[in-house]
Amino acid sequence: MDPDSTLPPLVPGTLYLVATPIGNLEDITLRALRVLRECDVVAAEDTRRSGQLLRYFDISKPLLSYFQFNEARRSEEIIERLRRGEKVALVTDAGSPGISDPGERVVKAAIAAGLRVESVPGASALVAALTASGLSTEEFHFVGFLPHKSGQRRKQLETLRAVPGTLVFYESPYRIDKLLGELNEVLPERQIVLARELTKKFEEYLRGTASELLTLLKSRTLKGEFVVMVAPAAA
């Protein structure tokens, strides 16, 4: 029996938030592939990158750019498409739309307009890193990317010192040294786990205090975005 034959068809006028692989293409879900095949249009953070993903799975769909600097205008267009009964799939470069990526604005607009929104879950750097970190997963606080300005970053880190549970950040390879330096000043005693290249050939976890990790990174040049996890304060 074809498993798709037992599944309900996509609903017209629905915004589908489709999670895409964070590195390993085998992590895409069967449901994600079905939605991408059956939708009317794919709104993508980077149409070139998403186009490559669609071609890999032999899917041909119109692509609509949706990113940080055009999301206000594009959100209005997507809402109009939904009102006409179109089925719109929203994807980002990797992971779930709206999680440290564009998506929140159009979701809020769709809900405010009384339109249907469905999540199509899948790969998540946050979950992948946290579950393999060895740190407490009973309670955690997802921060995402800190502000770029040093004063704002420091203020937020000072506030987070009192937050219970594991802290989870995203950071680029260009600012990882800066973040570790700030953590060394604000949370010097905490254990930290750096996760990089998740689901890829060179997936790696680095563990230690901020000071220890700074010393380690001096001898290495690391690429790819990091998930930075900070252990809770010792009881």
Predicted regions and their residues:
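Short, acidic/turn-prone active-site loops that include or flank metal/cofactor-
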Residues: 47-48, 65-72, 123, 144-149, ...
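Short hydrophobic/aromatic-enriched beta-strand-loop microsegments
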Residues: 60-68, 117-118, 138-144, 189-195
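Class I SAM-dependent methyltransferase SAM-binding "motif I" and its flanking Rossmann-like core
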Residues: 105-163
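Short beta-strand scaffold positions
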Residues: 44-45, 101, 170
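Short active-site oxyanion
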Residues: 36-42, 114-118, 165-167
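Glycine-rich, flexible N-terminal cofactor/catalytic loop recognition
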Residues: 2-68
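Glycine/small-residue-rich loop that forms an oxyanion/phosphate-binding "nest" at active or ligand-binding sites
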Residues: 67-70, 75-124
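A contiguous loop/helix-start segment that scaffolds small-molecule binding in enzyme catalytic cores
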Residues: 12, 87, 166-235
